[in-house]
Amino acid sequence: MRSGPPVDEKGISCIVCAFNEADRIRNILDVIVGHPALSEIIVVNDGSTDATADLLCSYPELRVLSHTPNRGKTYALSRGVAAARCEHLMLLDADLSGVTAADIDALAAPVMRGEAEVSISLRSNSLWIYRRLGLDFVSGERLVPRDLLRGAVEAMERLPRWGGEVFMNELIIRRGMRIAVVKWPRVVNIRKFRKAGLWHGTLAELGMIADAVSVLTPLGVVRQHLALLRLVNRPSLRARVRGWAERALS
């Protein structure tokens, strides 16, 4: 692991988990490397078998953690969390397209200004229902306090490959943390069928759903989404959610 230079511990550690993203990861690295809002950038190379490792070597500013074999995003994220040195963590997927420096600022701003404790992105290609509700509860782009996850590293290591976001959501709900939803209208993530082909990509997408359900149960998924919506830092949305919940229970 490259340890990197000293950092402002009051700042933001950015964590990017990557598996075979050599064709895409430059899109995000070219935006975040040198970004003034980020004190350090940690990239976890999750057992990549393509040219990801070689590409990362061309960015000396990064702290790179590598392991083999591929263990899945949640395990990779746990390693990044354990290594982070700053009080806040910005979590970003490696396959984003359309991200700008302004998007990074927008994701950081609500938390760093004290308006919320957590911020979560809402991408332009989030599922229609998420965009309609105003919250993508499995978004991989977030800003959270480090202490939310630092004590949960061992638990994260035991989670399914894609169980990290819903696990994190439960921690947020237990603490009653205020959430800011940050719209990223020009940002998309690359769907797995485009990366791995229709068959393997579809299986991977189904695997992500199965992992979320295995952590929560189907009813738990609905409950969690409603609980998160109640924490969104917009009074009008909170009122709408209370109305939906009351009608659903009546």
Region spans (language model):
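Short, well-formed alpha-helical segments that are part of the catalytic scaffolds
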Residues: 20-34
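Cell-envelope/extracellular polymer assembly enzymes that use nucleotide-activated donors
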Residues: 11-13, 40, 167
